[in-house]
Amino acid sequence: MSSESKTKTFLEFQFAMLLISGNILFAKLIDESVWMITFGRTVFASVGLYLFLKWRDKPVFFTTKTDNIASLGAGVLLAVHWITFFASARLASPAVAVLTLFTHPVITVFLEPIHFASRPKKTDLFLALLVLLGVGILIPELKPGNDLFLGILSGLFSAFTFSYRNLVAKKFLSHHGSAQVMFLQSLTAAILLAPVCYWDPIPTNYRSLGLMILLGTFFTAFAHTLYMKSMFQLKLKTAGILSSIQPVYSILLAWILLGDIPGYREIIGGVLILFAGTLETIRYKKEVP
């Protein structure tokens, strides 16, 4: 990959991270259950991506059974990831949800060698542990059994499913268009979550519906498609460590839009995460094409 292509991929990836960082704000902005928010975003993401693929005259389904099964599995993982992510935000706080989610660079460093012909280098382990340290500083004191503890467990499980979904998509689906890959994952998640309509009323007020449409189309369909496109061109561990900037983006957005002022923990942890991301960015740009 040329230096120009690397720069373009890096900028696309960072823009996707900035948009995805805004997802957590909807946990506070939308007055609906975690299940309904997740179901709504998958429905509107699926519709948006379907219309985009039809407009571009692109296929919406894969032609091989293996690819469709991989897409089904990735969609299930994506649904679980989104549910546990928003559950973490409700049980603990949006900050804790974002920060525990970003233990996934550490998880990715150890998962990737299992499925790809690569071994983690000492630098990979160092950067992953640096991210973990930054996240650890950001999380306040734990007390097992309370909502904070349950929120952190939910966030960690969200991190695992997110990391494994990326691995499945990278290994089995990276030769397909990112919009098609994201459409099938969103559709699978929407079908899986459809039963929520039986016990949770569908929102009828314009505010909730409008925010769900915005979350599903722009902050999910567009943002995650751009993320998938960039991720397919990067090593998983590189994507994981570079994406560790997302907690910093989320904290800044919450500060600007919701008035949540970061404390000293957020500042110190954010600096460590930024440092790890900067080192990985420099290393990525120096790699031989």
Stretch-by-stretch model annotation:
Residues 50, 56-95, 101, 137, ...:
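Specific transmembrane alpha-helical segments of multi-pass solute transporters/efflux pumps
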Residues 1-40, 47, 73-76, 84, ...:
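Glycine-/small-residue-enriched transmembrane alpha-helix faces in small-molecule transporters
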Residues 36, 43-44, 86-119, 158, ...:
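Specific alpha-helical transmembrane segments that line the substrate/conduction pathway
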Residues 49, 53, 72, 78, ...:
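Hydrophobic transmembrane alpha-helices of multi-pass small-molecule transport proteins
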